[in-house]
Amino acid sequence: LMRKDDLTTGPMALHFRTLAIPAAFGMLFTTLYNVVDVYYAGLLSTDAQAGLAIGYQAFFILMAVGFGLSSALSTLVSNAKGSGNAAEAQRYVVQGLAFGGVITASCMVIGWFLGPELIVLVSEPGAYRDAAMGYFYWLIFALPGFLLAYGGNGILQAHGDSRSMQRALMAAFIANIGLNPLFMFGLPGVWSGMGFNGIAAATIISQTGVMVYILVRIFRLEVMQSVQITAFQPDKDSFRK
């Protein structure tokens, strides 16, 4: 089983440090991750950089759902654990993952149709809008990686683990440095690459890796060891909470 910190015992200062420092490093590497994308887009053109910024604006609206999911799951699971109700904590973890899957699929469908309309709303016709459209359509497929990873991180934080997300984001940053040029420019004599959309492809792979790692960490939690597959069937009462 994975290491976990019990937030119901011990000094508050220790718990603040346990949660805050890894979270701060995770945010740092998220910023650096985006800097890498901007840098490689700049190797193509300023239109590519503008398209990156505009396409990501539309995507961020969808990604914000992940922040809400993280806060909700962290609160619900933490309250259940704090009250000593292991069964309720398990139910919130399982149903939280199920809800995350449902909301992710919904956001992908909604984003596919409404995202381009948002891009049109904030841009003028031109090369940078075309770049933003292509980038956004590809980036939609990274949405599960973002939403389920952030939602899952809320579950891990409720168990005192904010290190897993930090490590995952650090690894994603390093992977992004290598994946961006690979997908943008390809391999000489083998593959010509995807151009600007290669940035989105690199994001899909690296963020999906983050999601897989976070889910693996969740399923190694003690609370998940007795879970049956039928427990993941969506429950309306749990979803309402």
Language-model segment annotations:
Residues 25, 29, 33, 62-66, ...:
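Residue-level hotspots within pore-lining transmembrane alpha-helices
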Residues 100, 155-182, 197, 204:
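Alpha-helical transmembrane segments of multi-pass membrane transporters/permeases
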Residues 32-50, 119-126, 182-194:
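Helix-terminus/linker motif at the lipid-water interface of multi-pass membrane proteins
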Residues 14-74:
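Signature of the first transmembrane helix
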Residues 61-64, 108, 176-180, 211-215:
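Hydrophobic transmembrane alpha-helices of multi-pass small-molecule transporters
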Residues 49-109, 146-165:
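Small-residue-rich hydrophobic transmembrane alpha-helices
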Residues 21, 36-37, 73-74, 114-115, ...:
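Hydrophobic/aromatic residues in alpha-helical transmembrane segments
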Residues 1-23, 77-144, 189-241:
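Short alpha-helical transmembrane segments in multi-pass integral membrane proteins
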